[in-house]
């Protein structure tokens, strides 16, 4: 275990789900059927190593790190984290930016690169392009040389264009699954379209990957996807992250340092205003990530 003095953490959809208890499945699987199992929320964090366990090999006190807390508790001044859930934070990226990466950027990277097998020149659509996962997905897809279409609401179109989307679709005005355009790869980072709608929007040998959105869409991808995929060349499914690979954190940092991926941060809140941060996130208006700060950057 590594004791981290937390400088910044970020809010994710799972925090809102745990807080509100709106997902019975989540309550059932996390052991918090009647009340949250963990009193302190937060999975993503960035900070400095305060102390290490005797078997820790990769880090030393004073190292700047970022990663996942493993079992919530990141909205705090200190957090013990498994060694394999952390990576070194280079000086080129701020603590706030680093804290915005793990839960959002990892599924975007794995969904596009590994499950989606993205290739240069492909037509890629990101549904939910303005959220935490979506903003990373747009930029990562562009870094692979894809032609990217981002789907979001009216007020967020300009932001999605600004991070590299070649085309944008306002879902309040147009349903992309009912149009003539077909896509080689669709990454669902939001929305509630059915797996059959997504299938319709794919090219003849296209791929659909669910990484975020409604629980119904997740189970459709997980349970129906493999069977639908057996009936033709189209491949459909949900991304299930079973273990962390520190190398993926390194890949994301390299993209950042190359100027190809920049965390989109909507708002910063001090730890004392974490309730307001969660309330704002819950309204669904955030563009990119909402970040909680424990130590001001100028004092870090």
Model regions: which residues?
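A structural motif shared across PLP-dependent enzymes of the aminotransferase-like
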Residues: 69-83
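Glycine-rich beta-strand-centered segment in the early N-terminal region that forms part
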Residues: 1-10, 24-72, 189
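Short glycine-centered segments of the SAM/dcSAM-binding site in methyltransferase folds
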Residues: 64, 123, 206-207
């Amino acid at each position: 275990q590594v004791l981290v003095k937390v400088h910044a953490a970020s809010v994710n959809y799972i925090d809102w789900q745990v807080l509100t208890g709106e997902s019975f499945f989540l309550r059932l699987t996390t052991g918090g059927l009647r009340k949250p199992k963990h009193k302190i929320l937060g999975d993503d964090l960035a900070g400095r190593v305060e102390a290490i366990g005797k078997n820790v090999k990769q880090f030393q006190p004073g190292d700047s790190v970022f990663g996942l807390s493993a079992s919530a508790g990141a909205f705090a001044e200190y957090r013990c984290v498994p060694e394999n859930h952390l990576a070194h934070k280079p000086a080129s990226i701020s603590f706030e930016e680093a804290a915005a990466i793990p839960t959002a950027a990892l599924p975007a990277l794995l969904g596009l690169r590994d499950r989606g097998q993205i290739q240069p020149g492909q037509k890629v659509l990101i549904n939910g392009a303005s959220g935490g996962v979506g903003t990373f997905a747009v930029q990562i897809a562009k870094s692979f040389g894809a032609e990217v279409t981002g789907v979001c609401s009216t007020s967020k179109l300009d932001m999605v264009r600004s991070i590299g989307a070649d085309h944008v679709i306002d879902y309040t005005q147009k349903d992309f699954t009912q149009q003539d355009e077909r896509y080689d790869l669709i990454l669902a980072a939001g929305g509630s379209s059915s797996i059959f709608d997504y299938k319709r929007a794919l090219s003849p040998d296209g791929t659909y990957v669910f990484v975020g959105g409604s629980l119904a869409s997740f189970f459709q991808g997980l349970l129906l996807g493999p069977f639908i995929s057996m009936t033709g060349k189209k491949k459909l499914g949900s991304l299930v992250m079973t273990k962390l690979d520190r190398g993926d954190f390194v890949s994301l940092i390299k993209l950042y340092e190359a100027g190809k991926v920049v965390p989109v941060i909507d708002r910063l809140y001090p730890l004392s205003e974490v309730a307001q941060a969660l309330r704002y996130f819950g309204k669904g208006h955030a563009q990119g990530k909402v970040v909680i700060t424990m130590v001001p950057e100028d004092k870090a």
